Amino acid sequence: VYKRQDIVRLPVADQQKHGLVVSLSADDFVVNDTVPYLENRGVKGYFETRKLPLVVKEVKGKKAFHFEGTQVYTSSFMLPATLQDNAPYTLEAWVLNDSISENECVADFTTSHDELEKIMLVNGTEPRCGVINHYGWYEDAGYKDMKELAGKWQHIYICFDGRMEQVYINGKLVSEKDIQLLVKPSQFITLGRNAEGDWPFTGYLHSLKLWDEYLPLKE
């Protein structure tokens, strides 16, 4: 008797785009609030501290979460399947870093750590990978003049359509490359360090957003 092999399919919900996946903003809080939990305004869930809680400060006209290198948060939700493999994505953040080290991780959206499996927002002076790190080589992007941005607000905007990735800082295109990613299923998202617990971030985060779609920067 012929038996039909069942085709393994992801649940339909996993194949539908979420749009906004991660959305955090210090504007949701009052200055001097201590926040052990950050409610996510994208997909359902929250971020919880694994160590010390963040304190909300006001810095140069913006409310911001103050990272001192000791705060690490992880999400209660997995990275959606819509961001796996070579899927399009858009990432936006407002960051201020008083003293920019070589490698500091603001947010690691992935828990895998093989080549091209990372989407990691960094804020470092490393010219090869100091803005976005995919655990590639050519595929990563840095900014040679990053040190000049110390103590200033940086509007970081990164968009990838499945082929070309553009990286903007304060509206200036600092990288544009033809790349391919191999993002694997990821158990959680990490704030303040990478998933391996390295590259502590010391600075201020006003807001962070991640979409599972390509949204070119509007002029």
How would you name each of these model-derived features?
Residues 1-2:
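Short, small-residue-biased leader/transition segments that mark boundaries at the very start
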Residues 17-21, 25-50, 54-62, 66-130, ...:
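Extracellular glycan-recognition modules
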Residues 152-166:
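Localized edge beta-strand/strand-to-loop motifs within extracellular or lumenal beta-rich domains
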Residues 77, 130-155:
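Short, aromatic/His-centered strand-loop micro-motif at the edge of beta-sheets
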Residues 84-86, 148-151, 182-184:
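Surface-exposed coil/turn segments at beta-strand junctions on protein surfaces, enriched
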Residues 59, 176-205:
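Flexible glycan-contacting loops in extracellular carbohydrate-active proteins
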Residues 20-21, 153, 186, 205:
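Core-facing hydrophobic residues within beta-strands of well-ordered domains
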